[in-house]
Design a protein with these regions (language model features):
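Conserved alpha-helical scaffold segments that buttress catalytic/binding sites
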Residues: 1-285
Length: 285
């Protein structure tokens, strides 16, 4: 049984027993390749969420009407990526075992791998829907295979060809794009093709893990991230994508790569909070 976090995300006041969605944080950024600070993302989102209403006019739903439990942040070893991933996998597996949807707050994008390891053990036919500026398909980064630059490559090791669906991708090296052409379903620059994919996911009813790297957003709207990339989507485009893909059989999700200290205006944290609110409401069945 998980116990309540001291400061939970606004509106996430259900007990663990009654919850259908469980938030858990992974404050980890030890493989960051450019600007660190994503480890502070989960705490910042919880704290700043109290400047946000629980009600969404976009969806006419309120967090207080749902069943979300915030279990707080994991205590992770910054010196060992594998140790951190084992802890994340263990928490995700516990939540899945109890019949609830785990929603992970990063942290850098590598944390997704721990959650996907747990998900694919329970759902061997898992598909991954990935919103990101970066392909994250490197075999290794500076010799490290466990890096935020390699996370979708490691996920591919688990799920295989044709089960990773990537959107908004606008950055990566040549080998990553060549790998994607052979092994993943990549949609560059925006969400073109998401409606058709979602229709297929719904028809087949395959289990889906949704991973959202917030740097899919344009840095004019979301500068507070470790590796910003010009040419991203707007908040409203991301919201539309969430509301589209929610129709699929989503069994787990994450939101990652907010580095709050890199945006002293607080706009990035406020945006991340709003994305999380809309995602929570969309996933409430």
């Amino acid at each position: 049984m998980l116990h309540r976090n001291v400061e939970n995300f606004i509106g996430c006041d259900s007990s663990y027993r009654t919850a259908s969605i469980v938030l858990y944080g992974a404050p980890f950024d030890s493989t960051t390749s450019y600007r660190p600070g994503a480890r502070f993302g989960p705490a910042a989102m919880r704290h700043e969420s109290y400047g946000l209403e629980t009600y969404s006019p976009y969806q006419d739903k309120d967090l207080t009407d749902g069943n979300v439990f915030d279990s707080g942040d994991l205590e992770l070893c910054f010196g060992s990526s594998e140790s951190a991933l084992v802890d994340i996998e263990s928490r995700a597996a516990e939540i899945l075992r109890d019949g609830k949807l785990p929603l992970l707050l990063g942290g850098e994008h590598l944390v997704t791998l721990g959650a996907v390891r747990a998900a694919v053990r329970k759902y061997p036919d898992l598909h991954i829907v990935h919103f990101d500026a970066h392909a994250d398909l490197r075999e290794d980064y500076l010799g490290a295979q466990l890096s935020h630059a390699c996370v979708l490559r490691r996920c591919h090791d688990l799920v295989g060809d044709g089960r990773i669906h990537q959107f908004c991708i606008r950055s990566g090296d040549r080998e990553e794009f060549h790998f994607a052409a052979r092994h993943t379903d990549m949609h560059k620059f925006d969400f073109t093709g998401l409606t058709e994919l979602t229709d297929w996911l719904c028809q087949t009813d395959v289990p889906v893990y949704l991973t959202i790297d917030l740097d899919c957003l344009d840095p004019s709207a979301f500068p507070g991230t470790g590796t910003p990339e010009a040419g991203g989507v707007s908040f409203l485009q991301l919201l539309g994508a969430i509301r589209t893909v929610k129709k699929a059989n989503i069994i787990g999700a994450d939101v990652n790569e907010l580095a709050p200290m890199l945006d002293q205006s607080g706009v990035s944290t406020a945006t991340a909070c709003k994305v999380l609110r809309e995602l929570l409401l969309a996933l409430e069945k």
